[in-house]
């Protein structure tokens, strides 16, 4: 029941009236946002999350690490382009043309194709450097990544976010 009062003492509305008026709106919004939330706690699309799981399994990479990279590289937007790098994982067609051909990826803006190329490259870096921090810094194109004594802010952010996503997924 909503209370309609034309005048209030000291101009202050009774709290119960305000709550009763806004409660249906609050409930509707909470249902809307709860139902659209991603299961991993990430804001990237379900399609991208599925590709992260698929290529994570194929290459032995934690899917949450790939998701964290996507969040950092493109904010989960497959249409992003920056400095010649494109898509979710910011792949450079110039540097990864052969890799794309080998993997059969023709559209770098394709969610699945972009993640496939990024995971393949990251896997190669893991094999070469045997260190996830160094691999992330090289992926990011950081100079002297192999001789740095500490992780870069980029690598640290990716690892921290990956751990958060893993906890959200019960790992």
Please give the residue ranges for each predicted region:
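Bacterial N-terminal signal peptides
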Residues: 22-32
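Membrane-interface motif at the C-terminal end of an N-terminal transmembrane signal
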Residues: 34-36
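Catalytic glycan-binding domains that act on GlcNAc-containing polysaccharides
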Residues: 38-171
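Bacterial N-terminal signal peptides that target proteins for export
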Residues: 13-23
């Amino acid at each position: 029941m909503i209370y309609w009062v034309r005048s209030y003492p000291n101009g202050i509305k009774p709290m119960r009236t305000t709550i009763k008026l806004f409660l249906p709106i609050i409930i509707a919004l909470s249902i809307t946002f709860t139902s659209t939330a991603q299961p991993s706690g990430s804001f990237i699309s379900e399609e991208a999350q599925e590709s992260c799981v698929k290529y994570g399994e194929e290459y032995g990479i934690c899917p949450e690490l790939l998701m964290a990279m996507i969040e950092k590289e493109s904010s989960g937007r497959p249409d992003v382009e920056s400095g010649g790098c494109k898509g979710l994982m910011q792949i450079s067609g110039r540097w990864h043309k052969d890799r794309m051909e080998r993997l059969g990826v023709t559209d770098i803006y394709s969610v699945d194709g972009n993640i496939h190329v990024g995971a393949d490259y990251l896997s190669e870096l893991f094999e070469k450097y045997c260190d996830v921090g160094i691999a992330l810094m090289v992926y990011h194109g950081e100079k002297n990544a192999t001789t740095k004594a500490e992780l870069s802010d980029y690598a640290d952010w990716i690892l921290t976010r990956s751990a958060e996503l893993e906890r959200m997924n019960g790992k």
